[in-house]
């Protein structure tokens, strides 16, 4: 499979919309969830996602493959900047995505229990400070290394480790308040 870096550099050189579409398909879901951490509204997150890719298409910001960090961290940085500009304009507060759970009658008990735990996890995440929620999302959902998270969030590496530690402690307390004491992280 071709790397994101190669696809974007080819797109920047040749203007082939298929390359940009391939990148959108690869990163759509992750970016939407990331952007939902900034805005409370799925429509706003979708709009910010499209703005991010429009910026890639029209402005063609200079991705430098020789600089440290991956295409993914660069893309998330652009999305983050778009989200922060959006927040400044509209002054929204953040809320995480509430996951749709299928009808209970159609699911086995184990799936229902997992769905309920996930719902409680999202609910607990919504009580965290936005910076804790973002750092935990990038670390555990996007599986990004601390160095990339630092670049995306505009922090140094020690600050990222500190936020992860504080975020995990806050999440544990929130889950305990909800009656979940067996959470592993």
Predicted regions and their residues:
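C-terminal edge and immediately downstream basic/flexible tail or linker adjoining helix-turn-helix-like DNA-binding
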Residues: 10, 151-154, 168-185
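Acidic, proline/glycine-rich intrinsically disordered inter-domain spacer in sigma factors
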Residues: 100-126
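A short pre-motif secondary-structure segment
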Residues: 135-139
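Structural recognition of an alpha-helix C-terminal capping motif at a helix-to-coil junction
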Residues: 33, 47-54, 69-81
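Arg/Lys-rich amphipathic alpha helix in sigma70-family domain 2
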Residues: 62, 77-95, 114
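N-terminal module of bacterial RNA polymerase sigma factors
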Residues: 1-30, 180, 185
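Amphipathic, Lys/Arg- and hydrophobic-enriched alpha-helical face
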Residues: 24-42, 59, 125, 170, ...
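Sigma70-family region 2
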Residues: 12-13, 40, 53-68, 89
């Amino acid at each position: 499979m071709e790397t994101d870096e190669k696809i974007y550099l080819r797109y920047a050189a040749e203007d082939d919309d298929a390359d940009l579409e391939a990148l959108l398909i690869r990163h759509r879901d992750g970016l939407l969830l990331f952007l939902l951490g900034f805005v409370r509204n799925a429509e706003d997150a979708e709009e910010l996602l499209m703005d991010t890719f429009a910026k890639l298409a029209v402005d063609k910001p200079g991705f430098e493959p020789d600089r440290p960090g991956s295409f993914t961290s660069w893309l998330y940085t652009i999305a983050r900047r778009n989200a922060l500009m959006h927040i400044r304009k509209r002054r929204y507060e953040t809320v995480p995505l509430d996951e749709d759970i299928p009808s209970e009658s159609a699911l086995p008990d184990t799936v229902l229990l997992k769905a309920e735990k996930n719902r409680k996890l999202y609910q607990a995440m919504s009580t965290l400070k936005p910076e804790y929620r973002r750092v935990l999302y990038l670390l555990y959902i996007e599986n990004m290394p601390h160095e990339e998270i630092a670049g995306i969030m505009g922090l140094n590496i020690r600050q990222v480790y500190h936020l992860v530690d504080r975020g995990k402690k806050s999440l544990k307390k929130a889950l305990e308040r909800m009656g979940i004491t067996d959470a592993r992280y």
